[in-house]
């Protein structure tokens, strides 16, 4: 099972974003985002949800529970 911090790093790189761009999107400092990717600090669930929506992947995927990229559910 992949940790969420590894998964958000992988998704960022696949999407050709840098940490500063995602930090701006999430309205946080780049250093904070870097700490999330390194697993130094836990990312709040609200930010994980925003990233899952942004990348259009479900929470099971972004949290590393599943390796299947299902789309983010539309409600």
Which ranges hold each PLM region?
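A detector for short, charged/polar N-terminal pre-domain segments
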Residues: 1-6, 70-74
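Recognition helix of helix-turn-helix/homeodomain-like DNA-binding domains
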Residues: 27-42
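Short basic helix-loop element that most often maps to the first helix and adjoining turn
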Residues: 6-25, 50
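Short, charged recognition helix plus adjacent turn
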Residues: 53, 63-75
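Conserved hydrophobic/aromatic packing and binding residues within compact polymer-binding modules
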Residues: 8, 22-23, 33-36, 62
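DNA major-groove recognition helix of helix-turn-helix/homeodomain DNA-binding modules
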Residues: 27, 46-61
């Amino acid at each position: 099972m992949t940790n969420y911090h590894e998964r958000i790093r992988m998704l960022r790189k696949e999407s050709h974003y840098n940490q500063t761009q995602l930090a701006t999107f999430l309205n946080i400092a780049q250093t904070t985002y870097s700490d999330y990717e390194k697993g130094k600090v836990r990312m709040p669930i609200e930010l994980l949800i925003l990233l899952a929506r942004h990348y259009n992947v479900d929470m099971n995927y972004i949290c590393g529970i599943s390796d299947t990229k299902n789309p983010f559910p539309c409600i």
